[in-house]
Amino acid sequence: MKKIDFTAILFGLLLSAIAAYFMLRPTPSQSAPASSIPTVQIGNLIWDQTEMTIGDVKGFATTGFISAAEKKGGGLNYEGGFVQKPGWTWKTPYGVAAVDLEPAVHLNQKEAESICRYYGKRLPTDAEWTSAAFLEQRANPPAGYVKGQRYPFPGGSTPAVSHCLSGCGDYKGVAPAGALNRGTGHVITKTTKPGVNGMYDMGGNVWEWTATERNGGYMTRGASWWYGPERQQESDLESKPEDIAVVYIGFRCVADAVKQ
């Protein structure tokens, strides 16, 4: 009787399984929907160049997503204390129709993480965020930026490219007249000028959630249209409860660069 070589059979089965894995595994385009947000690579990370937009959250909402702010009837604004604003949600940040390229706000930290994950991305850690925001890492940055230099603002040496309450660039937010007790609201993404590493609105416009826990909440970075430029600096450590959804808090997503 001929002796069966089980080792060869097992080895063949193993090779077949490996081949099947590589043929059938999903590519990034197959495994996650495509985001409309432009990206830039900084080190080993691929960053969304702008904050998450209403348009991309609409894509996530096709899964049946309804935000906590929607379920409660509206998100929050600060008016000497947090006040619920009926009808203010990620789709209608100031209670009226918004355009798809506005930053998505009124979303809590867990919702932000879920939206990033839907697009095959994640929220950045605080260390990742500050590195991308303040340390110029482009090989050949444009005039006004120097590779390896750490800047005081995400916009560079000054906050001039950013949108904030005062002392920043000459921008006006899209909030309807009389809707806010302070400031003019956010501007549409990519309508300011790029800053360190070619990123838009890392300083000002809206706060950005991170994945880093602190003081029982999660750190937010970059400040917003509600504050002056001093809150944009790296030394400003701010954390907020994970379940809070506010008119001036948004986020951006990041992905780990895949080496081919």
Feature locations, PLM:
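Extended beta-strand/loop cores of jelly-roll/beta-sandwich
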Residues: K2-A127, F134, G217, L237-Q260
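Functional-site microenvironments in short loops/helix caps that host divalent-cation chemistry
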Residues: K85-E238
